[in-house]
Amino acid sequence: MKTADKTRETPAFPKTFIMAMIFGVGLNPVNSTLISTAPAPISHDLRIDAGRATLLISALYLTCAIAQPTAGKLSEIIGPRSVFMAGAALVMIGGLLGGFAPNLGVLLTSRVLIGAGTSCGYPAAMLLVRRRADRMGLAEPPSLVLSILAMVGLVLIAVGPPLGGLLVTFFGWRSTFFVNVLVGIITIVLGLASIEPDAKHEHRMTVSFFIAHLDVMGLLLFSITISALLIVLMSLPTFDKVSGCVTVIALLAFVAWELHAATPFVDVRSLAADNAMTLNFLRAMLTMLGAYVVMYALPQWLEDACHMNAGVSGMFIIPMGVVATVASLSIAKKPIVRLPLMVCCSAMVAVGMLLACTSSAGMVVLPLTASAVAGLVLGLSMSTSQTVLYRRAASEHIGTSSGLLRTSIYIGSIGASSLSGVFFGETVTDGGLHGIGITVAVLGVAALLATVMDRTLR
């Protein structure tokens, strides 16, 4: 049976289809990192302070955290091909708008459009892959295809900042927006050539039908919950009491509404009954926090506590990107998840211990090792959490579930940034890094215990 599945995997996923998925999925991570070197020239060119320019990064994160599951739900309602193409078109519009933007307001609008557009790629791609695999009768997840989708994010996270730096240096900051037009065109062309049209609907897509099946109230409450939660995280170490209260109230209202909704935005009842899926979201959030905290905190500590320049400190993140890619490749054709997840969570504990033992008076071996081990966490977490989701989610709900997985990852990455702010505060010290390390190690132990006790993993 396994041999038959292997032979049928190739025609189910031709190269043009895989290339379309790579470009569609890659739009999101490349836009998350490409602009990292642009806030300074933007603030100078538009005569705004640097703090306001960084809103361009926050705007995309907030939009994506909400738009990913929304795009997944839309893929299930109107079809993944339509959503995939619409997302690429939105990215092109956002790129043009940002490239010609005369002020910060237009730039923020551009980033919201880009965030919404890039959020369509991954959930739609997962639904497209699932439907193709189901049609071909594949008994196991198409692990190679899923690993490719995971590696796209890993590679672009690594190359995004230097690529953005080159674009800004040689073509100006507006090129980081204009590049979306070219990538959007390529995505649409590949999609038209390789993605089959969506099936015709039994019902007419009227406004009332659309609103009823999208669950607008559920979406609104979800958006309020996530927005308030991210504001709480981004305001740390100061706790925003108002946003904290809004988060709790909106979450309770969201759960209560979804439990009684005819077509819930998120099937809370099924999610509560499926502990494995819930644990997968939580584990992805924790492990991404453990990996991203190295990306955020280590360069900051190296620059402020060890007095390295930005160019040298950035080199310490290279092992992370290399190991993450190798780790993801190592399990590309292996559908097992239990052992890789246990290694992933154990590596997170090791990352925390390494950070807790690192000193500005010591050698560079420990921070370099911490970066490499964090790459192991990043690579294994991205690939295995995706495989677990593919196995656990019903075909008709995999779009929304894929979006929720991405939301979990966004919360983890923002949590990592907030953790750095809590322990570093106004002065970056060895003690702050040690506090971050201890916290990461404790969270890693919790993730490891949850993985060991999860008997659904294999």
PLM feature spans:
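Intrinsic disorder in cytosolic terminal tails and internal cytosolic loops
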Residues: 1-13, 201-208, 453-458
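Membrane-interface helix caps and helix-loop-helix hairpins in membrane proteins
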Residues: 104, 233-238, 333, 361
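Short, amphipathic, aromatic/basic-enriched membrane-interface segments that mark the entry/exit
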Residues: 75-82, 145-146, 207-218, 335-338
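Transmembrane-helix bundle of Major Facilitator Superfamily
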Residues: 2-199, 422, 426, 436-439
